Amino acid sequence: MRWNLVCLEKKKGGLGVRNLALMNKALLSKWNWCFTIESEALWKQVISHKYGVEEGGWCTRAVSGRHGVGLWKAIKKEWLGMYSSLAYRMGSGRRVRFWKNKWCGDEPLCLSFPSLFVISLAKDVWVLDVWNPDGVGDGWTPLFSRAFNDWEIEMVERFMLKIQAFRVQREDEDKVVWITSKSGAFSVKCFILF
């Protein structure tokens, strides 16, 4: 009997056995989710101290070494798999990458506006660093390596309209959101159904 038939629900003609590989991925991904949202948890502090944290603090650095790292290495590996289902709800903008994180629509700005990303002077800049709170009104100040050509003006207008819908809230924390659930929170069930 084929494994995919065994894993089908009983009402669909299967045996109703859960796909263990998928369940394992979901449970490992749950650890990644907990790492992103539990900022003060003791276990997170221990893991962060042992492996280091990537800038922004959403996940640990890549795990290297041969001894004693197998479990966290497997958990970290699932971070890459779940990353496409994450978005960022911007608060202060201190932990969200302006070009590379998904905070302003369905994809990162570097994918929505690749030709602008190419001429950007700061490709790894944080959202807060592109936000200018000075002057008459708050505004965005992305820096580019050259003046825009005539044929690029319409694209720049679309770009500016897209980001102008968002404002940095300095007193609020940046948050991660699981986009496949209505609540924005990760769940094993939602992961499996996705």
Give the role of each language-model region:
Residues 1-194:
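A helix-boundary/hinge signal
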